[in-house]
């Protein structure tokens, strides 16, 4: 008898995973899982873009592009001035129960005014708000962030860490309000490929995996509370998006 994730692993094809090429597993029924390719390798027609300071739908500087069949994030048209123009590219449909997988690597240097923390830093945003609901100058969608990081050559820097813009969650029996929590992943230096998977089961359990190993788990993702409450509205699902934080990926 296979566990849910063991069964999933038997049907993963590495050939489906290109630079930031998303694969989504929908449904948790007992039958054989089936993968759905989110990025078609040709264009961005199934995706919506929101960059800080620009209206939804405007791909400033051709930030998000398709290169040789891969989804690429680049800032070569920014004139070396990022100006905190954080961006996100959203898949057209929301999801609740799924396993999403990507392989990523970093391909260049960030603009000179990029934040230090954003060096070799990207992320998958899950259970997020829609791009249409974001304000013009909003940095990040309310969501759960699965960080995609690369080592900087200075100490340890795990990947698949958990950050929570506009959200909180439960871990080890208590509500966590700390913005970012480090995973147990090792550091990946250089421009090597790294595989990250996220298993999301609605508003219950979420787990991050790096190269097949579980590195962090938590539950009950929820919006930040209001009116003095301790808990917020549970997130049963939402948008999936990929960041642009100044690191070419």
Q: How would you describe each model-predicted region?
A:
Residues 3-16:
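Bacterial N-terminal signal peptides that target proteins for export
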Residues 15-26:
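Bacterial N-terminal signal peptides
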Residues 28-249:
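Carbohydrate-interacting regions of secretory-pathway proteins
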């Amino acid at each position: 008898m296979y566990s849910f994730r063991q069964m999933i692993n038997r049907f993963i094809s590495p050939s489906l995973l290109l630079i930031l090429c998303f694969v989504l597993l929908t449904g948790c029924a007992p039958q054989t899982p089936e993968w759905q390719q989110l990025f078609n390798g040709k264009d961005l027609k199934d995706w919506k873009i929101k960059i800080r300071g620009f209206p939804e739908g405007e791909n400033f500087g051709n930030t998000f592009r398709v290169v040789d069949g891969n989804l690429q994030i680049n800032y070569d048209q920014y004139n070396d001035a990022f100006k905190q123009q954080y961006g996100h590219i959203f898949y057209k449909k929301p999801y609740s129960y799924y396993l999403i997988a990507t392989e990523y690597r970093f391909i260049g240097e960030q603009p000179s005014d990029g934040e230090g923390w954003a060096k070799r830093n990207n992320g998958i945003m899950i259970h997020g708000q829609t791009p249409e609901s974001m304000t013009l100058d909003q940095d990040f969608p309310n969501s759960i962030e699965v960080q995609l990081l690369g080592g900087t050559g200075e100490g340890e820097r795990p990947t698949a860490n958990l950050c929570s813009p506009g959200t909180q969650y439960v871990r080890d029996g208590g509500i966590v309000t700390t913005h970012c929590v480090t995973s147990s992943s090792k550091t990946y230096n250089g421009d090597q490929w790294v595989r990250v998977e996220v298993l999301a089961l609605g508003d219950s359990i979420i787990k991050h995996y790096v190269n097949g190993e579980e590195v962090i788990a938590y539950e009950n993702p929820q919006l930040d509370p209001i009116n003095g409450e301790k808990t917020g509205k549970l997130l049963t699902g939402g948008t999936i998006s990929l960041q642009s934080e100044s690191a070419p990926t």
